[in-house]
Amino acid sequence: MKYKLFILACIATLISCRGDNDEKFYTGKVVFPVRPNMGVKEAMAARVVPYPRQLEWQKLEMTAFIHFTLNTFTDMEWGTGKESPELFNPVNLDAEQWVRVLSEAGMKMVIITAKHHDGFCLWPTKTTTHSVASSPWKDGKGDVIRELRDACDKYGMKFGVYLSPWDRNAECYGDSPAYNRFYMEQLTELLTWYGKVDEVWFDGANGEGPTGRKQEYDWQA
């Protein structure tokens, strides 16, 4: 009888240990112990699970990305930064129609190029005159970001912005400290003027600015 009890105790211990091992999950990341062997690494890495916000992002399933800027009127993928704001005059722009159609198509979030590489801003930024404020659209009083934001609110759509770090128009681009401040001011405007922004897209492109210099981005700012 004692022998049977001993065997049962051993089995229970093994099951308990196995259960602890299988149920140990790591959210977002895992920190390995000192000098672990490959088996330990593989076992621990296999139990890393996403953060709750990452799971919520996956549930969005489909997001619309709108590339709309001066390039729309010059038929160029990338602008040069020398285009005149006078070219921007979308007299029939209807952000509500955009969002309504996207919502009907099953999209749950819209992201727009608030600024692409040409440096033209779709909102009346205080950082540069290269924006909608200098265009004939609505006599310089239009704001594409505001109209899209309001349309997203109306249709229950999440809202995001793309802000290109590369700026082919800004004279301070290439003067790393100055442009980093300039860029942070633009990002701050977008994140504080329009309510909740659900997602921000950056870009790894790093070409030359109007002065022929490249920028060292302060990604940790």
List each model region and its residues:
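Mature catalytic domains of secreted/periplasmic carbohydrate-active enzymes
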Residues: N21-A221
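Bacterial Sec-dependent N-terminal signal peptides
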Residues: M1-K24
